[in-house]
């Protein structure tokens, strides 16, 4: 009988599959929101009036802040270490197309380059934008946006963790192989941007505020010593993002954009870390119109 119970327990542990929905402010929910914030499909500059049929090709590169060891304790409601410091940058390519009524349609794509164990997969963005007010010194534009796609990363069982003996400090989960975790960074939102035409024709400062509905999820797929852990975790929440930037027009076709964005994020941890959990990054963009 004792032997039967041992076999039954091991069989149960060999393939654990379940799903859970966590609060947006739980450590797991915060980690998903933080990663999603790094991929926000915000405007590279403010909505511009372009002619119907005009095409603009642009590329952007943004920073991803590094997290402390304490911030990476997000598993099991903030008790387990995860490897969240992956790629330090995020990039995308955009194509904008002029439509009638001063409207611009936009599609963006993140190339599937793997950096430090993280690889975007089928990460696409879509947006429509339009300037609504254009005065001599100030302008107002509105943009609606969305992103759909995944990022694969070895968060639960990283290469460094697997090198440590299972169930010892540094590998408390018992990882025996690199995990194949998949984070979905789906989101959609609305962005309003103000343009200030006060520094001449070449330099244009701008300010934008975005309201984003995030619907991230993660599938944990980790090989542990006593079985394969497969867990689906979901969360939902709304965030606000403040962006400040400046655009420099080299000429009518070439524009350089510099900006920074701040997304306040709250998290309830077993031990408070103060106000260090919000997302703040910097972005560099370049546009060429045909």
Where on the chain are the PLM-derived regions?
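N-terminal signal peptide c-region/cleavage motif recognized by signal peptidases
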Residues: 13-17
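Transmembrane beta-strands of outer-membrane beta-barrel proteins
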Residues: 58-62, 106-110, 140-147, 206-210, ...
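Repeated loop/turn-to-beta-strand initiation elements of outer-membrane beta-barrel proteins
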Residues: 102-107, 135-140, 202-205, 252-258
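Outer-membrane beta-barrel transmembrane domain signature
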Residues: 20-34, 63-74, 157-254, 262-268, ...
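Transmembrane beta-barrel outer-membrane domains
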Residues: 84-90, 117-123, 181-187, 233-239, ...
